[in-house]
Every structure is written in C-alpha cells, then in structure tokens.
Swiss-Prot record:
GO terms for molecular function: phospholipid binding; protein homodimerization activity; sequence-specific DNA binding. The keyword Transport does not apply. Keywords: Cell cycle, Cell division, Cytoplasm, DNA-binding. It is found in: Cytoplasm. Signal peptide: none annotated. Gene3D superfamilies: MatP, N-terminal domain, Met repressor-like. Pfam families: MatP, MatP_C. Required for spatial organization of the terminus region of the chromosome (Ter macrodomain) during the cell cycle. Prevents early segregation of duplicated Ter macrodomains during cell division. Binds specifically to matS, which is a 13 bp signature motif repeated within the Ter macrodomain. Belongs to the MatP family. It comes from Escherichia coli (strain K12). One of its GO terms (biological process) is regulation of DNA-templated transcription. This is Macrodomain Ter protein.
Length: 150
C-alpha cells in the first residue's frame, strides 16, 4: 500500500461521506424498513466525535451497495491528503472553458503527454519564443548601431 492508513482520520471521512449521502437522499443503511433505517442513521449522527465507533456502525448497518463507492472515495481522499503534504505532489485545479480543455486535451493526446506536461511544454515554448524575440531585437539594434557609426 502506497499511502498509510490513519484510522481516526479515515473514520471521520467515512462519517462525513455517509452523512453527506444520507442528506442527498441515498439509502445508507441495509434496512428496508424506514424506522429501522432512521434509528441506524440517528446512531450514526451521534457518532460524529467517536471515530473509533464509526467502523463498527459501518460493519453492522451500512448498505452493502455503498461499500465499494466509499472505499474508492476514501482511497482518493487518502491520496490527496498525503500528496498535499509535499509541494511537488500537491494538486491544484483550474477552471477552463470546455473548448479550451478540448483543444488542450487534443494537443496532449497528439504529443502523447499528460495535460500538465502539455501545459508546461506550452509555457516553455512561449518563454523560448520570448527569449528568441528579445535576442533578435537586441541583435537588430546592435547591427543598426554598427551600421550607423560607419
């Protein structure tokens, strides 16, 4: 396993995940009967500050259909948590208009690179073009100065 599991922290994430799903109207318990489901949800809500007990609630009451989705969510959250500790692995998001994203994705695909690598390459290309333009301008001025002196 690449990322260390932190039981208390992840139990808090699981609690938040389940509460969010409940508020969105999903069935988070394995019970069909509404009163039994509500009792289990009430118990879960009371466990907010008891992360160790959340895993017990999950084993006993959680809807089996949510198991894989919750595991995926927690795995992604764990990865983001550990990557955020180091500047070089921290991820940032940017908003792009769809057409811009589409063109960038097409360029990345043609170049066989990731979106991030393509953006870095475009920036480097622009910087090199700017350096070249400055150098040519400087050479042009030097040449004009030489020709003007003679």
């Amino acid at each position: 396993m690449k990322y260390q599991q932190l039981e208390n922290l992840e139990s808090g994430w699981k609690w938040k995940y389940l509460v969010k799903k409940h508020r969105e109207g999903e069935l988070i318990t394995r019970y069909i009967e509404a009163s039994a489901a509500q009792e289990a949800v009430d118990v879960l809500l009371s466990l907010e500050n008891e992360p160790v007990l959340v895993n017990g609630w999950i084993d006993k009451h959680m809807n089996p259909e949510l198991v894989n989705r919750m595991k995926q969510t927690i795995r992604a959250r764990r990865k983001r948590h550990f990557n955020a500790e180091h500047q070089h692995t921290r991820k940032k998001s940017i908003d792009l208009e769809f057409i811009v994203w589409q063109r960038l994705a097409g360029l990345a695909q043609r170049r066989g690179k990731t979106l991030s690598e393509t953006i870095v390459q475009l920036i480097e290309d622009a910087e090199n073009k700017e350096k070249y333009a400055n150098k040519m301008s400087s050479l042009k001025q030097d040449l004009q100065a030489l020709l003007g002196k003679e």
